[in-house]
Amino acid sequence: MARYVFITGGVVSSLGKGIAAAALAALLQARGYRVRIRKLDPYLNVDPGTMSPYQHGEVFVTDDGAETDLDLGHYERFTGRPANQQDNITTGRIYRNIIEKERRGDYLGATVQVIPHVTDEIKNFVLEGNEDYDFVLCEIGGTVGDIEAMPFLEAIRQLGNELPRGTAVYIHLTLMPYIPAAGELKTKPTQHSVKELRSIGIAPDILLVRADREIPESDRRKLSLFCNVRESAVIQALDVATIYDVPIAYHKEGLDSEVLSAFGIDPAPKPRMDRWEEVSHRLHNPEGEVTIAVVGKYTGLKDAYKSLIEALHHGGLANKVKVNLDWIEAEVFESEDPAPYLEKVHGILVPGGFGERGAEGKILAAKFARERKVPYFGICFGMQMACIEAARNLVGIEDASSSEFGPTREPVVGLMTEWLKGNMLEKRAAAGDLGGTMRLGAYEAVLKPDSKIAQIYGSTDIHERHRHRYEVNIDYKDRLEAAGLNFAGMSPDGVLPETVEYADHPWFIGVQYHPELKSRPFEPHPLFASFIEAAIEQSRLV
C-alpha cells in the first residue's frame, strides 16, 4: 500500500516546494523505495501550454505529450523516473472534467458543488494508479491562504481522514526571514502560516523551514511549541550553492529520517548517497570552465529555460568543467554587431521559442557561428533559424523566411498539419485550438549512420520529445544539402527534418526536438555532453 506525503507552502511563493519534493523523493529512492511525485496546480488554465513564459516559466513536456509545470522537470532529473500526464493536474482540468460529466448526466441531476464534486475529483487524481509505489509525494502549488488553493487543501484534508491511519504525512515549507535591524530570524510568519493551515483542518507533521543562516535551537523550540510539531520535526532548509546539494543537505538535517519516523518505519534501510556526493563533488571541484552564449527571447526570466540550464550544467558534469552562461537578448543583434558579444564565448546556443520577435538576431547568431567555426547548438526554433540563415547566405534565397512570421514567397519553415506517431498519422487543423495544434511528446527519428550526431548518440534510432507547430520545409532539403547543410536526421517516413549539421564545421548541430528535457545529472544527454566538449576545445583557441 502506498503512503502519501502532502507538501504545502506558506509565507511567500517561490520557496522551492518542487525542489523539496524532488529531493525528498531522491532520498527515499536512495533507501530503496519506489517513489512517485505529483503536482497539483491551482490555476484555472487547463495546462501551462498557452501561458507566457514570463508568467509561468518553462513548459515541461513529457513522453506522452503532456504540457506540464516545470517542477515535473525537477522530479525527473532528481529521480530518473519519466513523468506523464497523470502526474500534473490543474484546476482547469478538474473543472473541465466535472463540466463534461455534468453535461453527460453522470451526476444524475445533483447540484454540482465544490464539496463534494471538485474535492472528489482531486482525490481521485491523487489516489489513481499508485499500486506500484511505496510513497506518493503530492506538491500543492501556490501558498496557503490563496483562494485558488482552497479546494486542493480541503481535498488533502479529507484524504488525511479517509486513508488508513499512519499512511498520510503533511510537510509545510515556510520561510524564516532575517531582519537586519533586529539582528535575528523571525518565527512569526511561520506561526501565522501554520495557524492558517490548521484553520483549514490540516496539522503539519513536519516543518521544513527555509533560512539563509542557521536556526538557533531556541527558535526551533519556539516553532515546535507554537506550531504543535515535535522539535525533531522542525527541519532547517538552509540555502545551498546548487540544487543538487539539496538532497545531501536535507539528509544531514534528518528530513528523510523524520518522514519515515512519522510513518512508523523504524528501522529504515540506510540510504546510498554516493552518486549525489559524486555530483556535488564535481560541481564544486571543476577542472576548468567554459562560457556559453544563450541567444534567446525570454532571457529576462531564466525559469523559461530551466531544463536547458540544467542540461548545460549536466554537460559540464560529464566533462568536469564549470559552465558559465552569457544571456543575450536576441533582439540586440538586430541593431548591433554580434561580434563583440560572441567573440569571447566558447559555444553558442539558440533555444526554442515562438514568434517573430528576435528571429533576425538568432539568424545572425547562427551566421556568426557558421562563419567563425564556433560550436553552435540550435534547438527547435534554433534549428529553424540556422536553416533560414543557410538558405539566405549559402543558397542565395534572399526572401527565405518562416510562415510563422507571416506570408512569404520562400517558406523554408512552414506549419505542419500532419505527421506520423508510431504507425498512425496524426493531423492538426491550423485553425484549431492553440493548445491542440502542436506536435507534442516523444517521437522517433532516424539518423544517417555516417553523421556526426549518430556518432554522438552511438545509435541511428532515437526517441526525443517535441513541442512545435512549425517544421523545416522538406522542399528546400536538396538545395540546402547541396550548399553543405546535411539533413542528418529525419522522421521514419522521411518527411520531417529532425536534425541538421555541417560536415566541415567543428560542431554545428540543429535539432527540431528538445533534448534538454531528457537530461539527468547522473545521465547527461549525449548532445549536451558533446557540445560542452566542443566548447572546451574552442576555449583553447580563443
From Swiss-Prot:
InterPro entries: Class_I_gatase-like, CTP_synthase, CTP_synthase_N, GATASE, GATase1_CTP_Synthase, P-loop_NTPase. Mg(2+) binds at residues 71, 139. Residues 291-541 form the Glutamine amidotransferase type-1 domain. It catalyses: UTP + L-glutamine + ATP + H2O = CTP + L-glutamate + ADP + phosphate + 2 H(+); L-glutamine + H2O = L-glutamate + NH4(+); UTP + NH4(+) + ATP = CTP + ADP + phosphate + 2 H(+). Catalyzes the ATP-dependent amination of UTP to CTP with either L-glutamine or ammonia as the source of nitrogen. Regulates intracellular CTP levels through interactions with the four ribonucleotide triphosphates. Belongs to the CTP synthase family. This is CTP synthase. It comes from Brucella abortus (strain 2308).
